[in-house]
Amino acid sequence: MKFRVVVMMEVLAGIAFFGFNSASVAAEWESTLAAAKKEGKVAVLTDVTATLRDALTLEFQKNYGITVELFGSSGREVAPRVAAERKAGQFLWDIYIHGSTTALEAMIPMGAFDPLEPALILADVKDPKTWRGGAIEFLDPSKMVLVMTPFHRGTIFYNTKLVDAKEFKSHKDLLNPKWKGKMVVDDPRRAGPGVATFTFFYLHPELGADFIRALGKQQLTILRDYAQEVDAVGQGRYPVLIGTADFVAITRARQGVPIAIVDARQLKEGTDLSPTNGNLALFNRAPNPNAAKVYINWLLSKDGQTIFARANGYVSARLDVPTDHTEPWRVPLPGAIKTYTKAAMQVKDNLQPLLQEVFGSQ
C-alpha cells in the first residue's frame, strides 16, 4: 500500500512539475513575443535567392507582424563586412544563416556570436527527440552555431542537353580526357562549396591528393560566383561543373534551365554531408534581441524548417519535416564524410598548400 502511495505521489509530482514547466515556457514565450513586437523587426544576414528570401520573410511576418530585414551576401563577403561594421561601432545584425567555414574560421574567432541554446524556448524545438541523431547538432563546443540542414550535397553538376548522367559512376570519371578544358569549378581556395567538395575529395580514401592533382590537369575553369558558375553550364558554355552551391542550381532548374545534379547513389564514393548555408547563429549585441529569439524559434519549428528546406531543396535536421520535396539521395546516411566540422576543416593545413600547388595562388 505504501508503495502505491509513493508511486502515486511521484506521478502527481511529475504532472505538477511538467504543468508548471509548460506554464513557465508559455509565459516566457508570450513575454518574449510582446517585447519582440515592440522592437518591430529582425535583421537577418544570409545567402539569398528570390525563393529563399520569400521563405525567410513572408510566413514569419504574416504570423508575428514583425518585419524581417534580409540582406544577402556570399560567405566570402560576410566576415569582412561584419568586422568593418563592428570596428566602426555598428552592430546591425540579429541572425546569421550561412555557411560553416565562415562561421568556424571567421565569425566565432571574431567573437560575433552568443551561445544559441539559451535562445531556444519552444518545447518541441528543445526536445532532443525532434532531431536526427537524438540531439541538436552544433558546430562548436560553445553551441553558438546550430546545424539546421545536414544533407548530401551535389558534387557534379551537368547540362542535361549535353551530358548523360550515366557517364558518371565515380568521381574518377571526371578524369576522362573528353572533359579536358570543358569543366567549371567553384574556386576551392576560398570559403564555399568548392573547398567543401575538395575537402571531400581529400578525405575520401579512394580519392585523396593524387585524384586532386590529376583533376587539376583537366584544365578547369575556376570561377568565384555561384550564379556565373551555374549559368555557364545552364547556357551550354561548359557541360560540367564541380562543387557549386546546390541551392543556386536547384533554383535555376526550377526555372527551366537545363542543369541537374548527379545522383550521389550512382557515384562509387557517394558525396559529403554538409548543411551548406543552413547554419543558424545569434549575433551578440543584437539590436533586436527579442525579435531574434522569436525568429530563431519559428525557424527551428516544424513549419519554419519545412518552409526553409523546401525553398532550398535541403533536408532538415528535424525528423518530422518531410523530405518529399527533394531527391532521396539527399537524406543523411550513417558514416558519411562530414566536410563542415572543425575536424574536417583542420585538414586545410594540408589541403590548401595542395590546392595552391594544383591551381596556383589566388
Positions of predicted regions on the chain:
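Bacterial N-terminal signal peptides
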Residues: 8-20
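Immediate post-signal peptide segment of exported/extracytoplasmic ligand-binding proteins
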Residues: 25-43, 61-62, 175-181
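Extracytoplasmic ligand-binding site segments that recognize negatively charged/polar headgroups
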Residues: 43-57, 69-83, 91-230, 234-237, ...
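A ligand-binding cleft/hinge motif common to bilobed small-molecule-binding domains
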Residues: 103-106, 239-260
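A bilobed periplasmic-binding-protein/Venus flytrap-type ligand-binding module shared by bacterial periplasmic
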Residues: 155-162, 199-203, 275-288, 307-308
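Periplasmic-binding protein-like
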Residues: 212-216, 221-223, 256-284
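Mature extracytoplasmic/periplasmic domains
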Residues: 278-339
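Extracellular/periplasmic bilobal clamshell ligand-binding domains
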Residues: 322-362
